[in-house]
Amino acid sequence: MINYFKKYFKNSPTKQAFLQKNLIPFDLGKMIRVGNNKDGGYVVSENGIKSCEFLLSIGLGFHFSFEKDFLKLKKSDSLLIESYDNSVSKKIMREYSTQNLIRLFFRPSFKTFQRSIRYFEFLLLFNSSKAIHVEKNVSEKKSENSETLNSIFQYLKQNNLVKIDIEGGEYILIYDIINNFNKINILIIEFHNLSNLENREKLDFFFEKVSEYFYLSHLHMNNSNGVSVDNFPDTIEFTFEKKCLLKTNVKKKLVNFPLDKLDYPSSKSTGDYNLIFK
């Protein structure tokens, strides 16, 4: 069983059995990392990402290495990426890079240099015909500054990779995600604020639904937010891949995490969390 969940569920055999059954990933063949070796990179199966023709990215922030790598993997001149995030724009990116450029003169570092050119990377990515950034959030209700997931999926075709990292906003999208399983090949999603018991119940509910149609291929504890007082990780990253696209004799993968040369700590200031399955 997983060391980080033992303590919380030691008096609940039903939940412990559920987690033991579902949180052990399946062996879907060769796994690759898409994105950088820190926060913003995720692990998927090589065969799974080949099946994806389009990336719907919900939550961008200042890290878009995943989106850049997705473009490199796809050889097409058509639109490949649509990203939603109201917290970033060309203006915000320009100000962010300018501040770091000034800082670079006084306290030079490679990290500051990387941040100083982020605006130009943003322009290169989203000024092309292959990727667009929509300055709206994705929520349960449509408004001037937000779009609904259902309305986005209405015009999307099949074979999509959906990546969701919206700092706790994922919970209000759970039902919309479930309603559109048929258009998703791979779902990468971060669940935040799991120190909140209500959020853990929502995660349990989602797992029951997603496990009907998808295999869990990977999970990783985001070490940026630590663990709660009962030793439960506050943020977990999940990769789910559609069952019908894969061979039928898929088995659980009894390996320990993090995976060497695939998993990296989200924050370099502290060590990565271990998941012990064997």
Language-model features: locations:
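Short amphipathic alpha-helical surface micro-motifs
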Residues: T14-K15, L23-D27, K38-D39, T112-Y119, ...
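Conserved acidic-Pro-Pro-aromatic motif
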Residues: C52-L56, F66-L80, I92-E95, S151-K278
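Conserved SAM/SAH-binding loop
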Residues: E135-E147, I166-G168, Y175
